[in-house]
């Protein structure tokens, strides 16, 4: 079973770009380890093609070489936060909410048309950190768009925003999962990986 992880720096997580089987230090590492342990008889191939800094338009541009060409059985997609982040970066790339929806829809339509993969979407999130407070209103507008696309295209959806909100009620330390509100530390990566692995299990066991 071939599983492709696709996304931005949260997925990339320091992986070796010369070796797409390298999971890096992020959630793909944890998800792949959990699945390998849970299904020891399954012949998994895990491929991490996340690229740090990517927006939805950039993911679409590399979708064939970095996703479709692998002929995945399952693909997970975590993308969208950089479309907001880059509105404030030095380059100030102004991607509108409508453009994000158009880009993301194009990604999903192409995956549906050109692969037989089960599609798992993950919601972008912002954790409790002053560094990202200026982005919260924009993420609040983006999340319903992503949920609507998930209803239309995805086989499964991981609501990371809600899952983190609930987890932080039990672990209120803001820096427990991330130092900057976006990029997970080991605790955050394990949290995402565990929830994604549980979602994959639901697909594998069908």
Where do the protein language model's features map onto the residues?
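Serine-esterase "nucleophile elbow" of acetyl-processing enzymes
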Residues: 1-52, 63-71
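Alpha-helical cap/lid subdomain in secreted, periplasmic
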Residues: 30-42, 58-206
